[in-house]
């Protein structure tokens, strides 16, 4: 009498299971990590959106992109080892700085200068290398400072 139950798969089922496992390994070469808490910003100030790869990996040859929602124009694009301002939304041109000093370790940031109230909301930090890609969702909360009137 056998003490442990054994699973037996047909040859085609075993091959399919192996292929699915390999596909999962290929597509999960890295994940993108961003802050879990909302990023707080004030109108007129600068704010920094940070994200990084896990495990740590050189991203110099990857595409890195920030955008507001899926399929929307980009807030910022880094591709082919350089910034691609021609793909950037007009309202962000000249107002962003790509911080890439740690890109060889998979860590990047985007500084948005002179934040406006309309920039409140969700941002996505997206990395792609070949067919592998992932994104982190960041939440930006923009507040306006109100000046108290003195009588």
Where are the regions a protein language model picked out?
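Well-ordered beta-strand positions in beta-sheet-rich domains
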Residues: 38, 63, 135-139
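Solvent-exposed, conformationally flexible loop/turn segments
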Residues: 42-44
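Ligand-binding face of N-terminal immunoglobulin V-set domains in extracellular IgSF glycoproteins
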Residues: 46, 50-52, 93-141
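N-terminal Sec-dependent signal peptide, specifically the hydrophobic helical h-region
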Residues: 1-39
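Short structured motifs
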Residues: 33-36, 80, 108-110
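N-terminal V-set
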Residues: 54-95
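Flexible inter-domain hinge/linker segments at boundaries of tandem extracellular adhesion modules
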Residues: 19-33, 67-72, 132, 138-151
